[in-house]
Amino acid sequence: MTLSTPSAPATALPLARTVPRREYWFGLPALCTSARSARDTVRDRLRAWELPGDTCCDAVLLVSELITNAVLHTGSGRVLCGLTLTGDERRLRIELHDECSAPVGPPEHRAGPGEENGRGLLLVQQIADSWGCARSTRAEGKVVWAELTAAC
């Protein structure tokens, strides 16, 4: 897989295609150690919802990247993570709300070839069916969201 500059994310939250059937929210302190807690929480919840293993693995990676970005780049004290499974149980939406007051949009920095960090949103772009960011309606900052189609 070749990673390039992330394309601009969608700036509006698309309307849900169907009425949500299952929803789960949890908050965490914005600490480096919270990524592990988030991964464990998401993995446990999606297994309880009996989602396919591939979907669970992709969702765990997405949450890990989103929370790591929030911790490293937003100055937030807390983050709020939401999982929503649509009524047809085929679409999983992941939301990460932070306390960042910076303008909504893709980051300015692009990782160079020798840099170890700076490719998280490229992974999000490659793994998610769709993703974007907008002003949060649940926190004082923004929300970065990603959607997956559950593997059959």
State each model region's role.
Residues 1-25, 71-152:
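Conserved beta-strand-loop-beta-strand hairpin that lines the nucleotide-binding pocket
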Residues 33, 50, 54, 111-118:
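Residues at secondary-structure transition points
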Residues 40-64:
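Conserved short strand/loop->alpha-helix "switch" segment adjacent to the catalytic nucleotide/phosphoryl-transfer site
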Residues 28, 46, 62, 66, ...:
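Generic leucine side-chain signal with a strong bias for well-ordered alpha-helical environments
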Residues 25-37:
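STAS-typified acidic loop motif
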Residues 58-76:
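Histidine-centered phosphotransfer motif of kinases
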